[in-house]
């Protein structure tokens, strides 16, 4: 008996020693299969809907979830059950994660957060085990919210081949589908998930009964951008006379995360300059930093290069101003930036712009060719400065023909499909090689036509081109008001 007791004691000592060396009970070996979900317990000081600006439609959709978590009985009395899952879809930086936290904050319930990539492990079966553990914890804490960020990491469409795909990822997805089937809509566990690749998700995951509701979280419009700027401006010391509407118009197409970065950059610039608060100029400069990078202070152009860049930028602005339905010129500069731009012309729409006519798109192509056209008109030569303009003009002309049906030859036939619309919109042609050759010819003809229009506009307004270029050369940066004052001067 005594030798047996001694043997057990020695075994326990060795076991404790091994656990210490491996990091104790919290080590990887002893935590396999645990979800590692970040749990934010309910708190009255959490993120609320008031902290999320610019996404009114998404908030309206999610308010019903909050009401259910507050008072589920009124839904149960009528026999209604909440959606088991809500899928938040939209471009990066639009506030999908923040909205999910705001739902939990408004409902004052626990919030389990986990990224899709955290489920996939090197050991087969660990991902499925983590899913089981996550849902077990959620049911114990119900009512609560489970949030899976970047769900496309585990929710991608399964391959049709017998041996295709990632076995571990597919097992994890299968377990997630099983868990979502395993509880009713009245259990008090709401699953929120976010993705910017909804088209890649498995149909079994997005069908009714699993993710019943899809909530788009799009880029904010003008009013949304203004509201977001005001929310983030509360976090810094800022001048009282800041025109947030103007800043919002200048930041067209910016996401909520980018707008937050713009406000923060303005505060950092104020500190660098030794001021106690940020100003309108700080915010405007921050937008330019996001668009074109920081000013390149050590870049010194020759006088000849500076003249070329001045004419190039005035060429853009003059062609834009001489056409109808073009966005007003906000600013023109020939100060080099870290993005590689030696100068740029900023145009800002007066309000929201949801549609573009064929004429407007052609005018935009003409404006893009205006820089090169000015070089040809004045110097009789061309430079590499128009490389980005050429790329944008070609892309726009191709889209007119292949996607928007603005070609008489092809009429309303889609020649191009867009994939990953929330991640830049990769395109692929869906036509024969002969048709592709015809498309190329029409793209060349369209850009050439607008280039010739730009050349004519600049030739007809050569005196103003010279006067404005000389003014820009001297000042280096001019406002849209200064540009229009000289242009309209008799």
Regions found by a protein language model. Give the residues of each.
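Short pre-active-site segment immediately N-terminal to the catalytic Zn-binding motif
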Residues: 297-308
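Soluble catalytic regions of large protease machineries
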Residues: 83, 306-310, 317-490
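Flexible hinge/switch segments at interdomain interfaces of large molecular machines
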Residues: 34-42, 105-110, 152, 196, ...
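Proline-centered turn/helix-capping motifs that create local helix->coil transitions or kinks
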Residues: 18-24, 74, 146-147, 151, ...
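Walker A/P-loop NTP-binding motif of AAA+ ATPase domains
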Residues: 37-248, 254, 266
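Long amphipathic alpha-helical segments used for membrane anchoring, targeting, substrate engagement
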Residues: 1-43, 400, 422-424
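Conserved C-terminal "switch" segment of AAA+ ATPases
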Residues: 184, 203-204, 217-284, 293-296, ...
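Hydrophobic alpha-helical transmembrane segments of multi-pass inner membrane proteins, especially
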Residues: 10-12, 16, 272, 289-296
